[in-house]
Design a protein with these regions (language model features):
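Periplasmic c-type cytochrome electron-transfer domains
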Residues: 30-52, 138-140
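N-terminal "domain-start" segment that seeds a small globular fold
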Residues: 43-86
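Structural microenvironment flanking redox-active thiols in thiol-disulfide oxidoreductases
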Residues: 104-165
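Short pre-active-site segment immediately N-terminal to redox-active cysteine/selenocysteine motifs
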Residues: 91, 98-101, 128
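Membrane-interface motif at the C-terminal end of an N-terminal transmembrane signal
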Residues: 16-35
């Protein structure tokens, strides 16, 4: 019985410590749900585990050409403006599927660092989508505000789109 009580006390102390850690990590976060705060706090461990296990890494092979050039396409920015991808010629372009309520939401921090560091050579385009377990429920305006306030995102975000049809 004493061991059980000791175990429960240790468990409660660990939980309380983790709750305090989550609050400290998110002290400057604005309008985040507790789930978003929790995911932001555990993101470094999630990324470490992902790298350790080799999950989410894929190398594409083959010489298959796309039916149309990327630079012949246009997209809608989340403010309603049209982005002509021809304007991006001469730069590397990174397309990223994003969501504000998933385990990888903190990737916005790293993406913004990349955008800042390579601003003359790299364009990052964020494509928010709600296809995966309702992880992007907000409107385009809410998404943009969330990303700017909590992660300092300045790279272009496209209109919320559908990845899976």
């Amino acid at each position: 019985m004493k061991k059980l009580k000791r175990f429960i006390i240790v468990l409660l102390v660990l939980i309380a410590t983790f709750v305090v850690y989550v609050e400290i990590v998110n002290r400057n976060s604005i309008n985040m749900t507790y789930r978003q705060k929790l995911l932001k706090a555990v993101y470094p461990a999630l990324m470490w585990f992902t790298k350790l296990t080799g999950k989410n890494t894929k190398e594409l092979a083959g010489n298959k050409q796309p039916p149309v050039s990327f630079y012949s396409l246009k997209g809608q920015l989340n403010n309603g403006d049209t982005l002509d991808f021809a304007e991006l010629k001469g730069k590397k372009v990174m397309l990223v599927n994003t969501a504000s309520d998933c385990g990888y939401t903190n990737q916005y921090t790293d993406l913004q660092k990349l955008a800042d560091e390579y601003k003359d050579k790299l364009i990052i385009l964020g494509f928010p989508a709600n296809d995966f377990k309702d992880q992007e429920k907000g409107t385009d305006e809410e998404i943009a505000t969330f990303c700017k306030k909590n992660y300092g995102v300045t790279f272009p975000l496209m209109q919320k789109s559908t990845v899976i049809q």
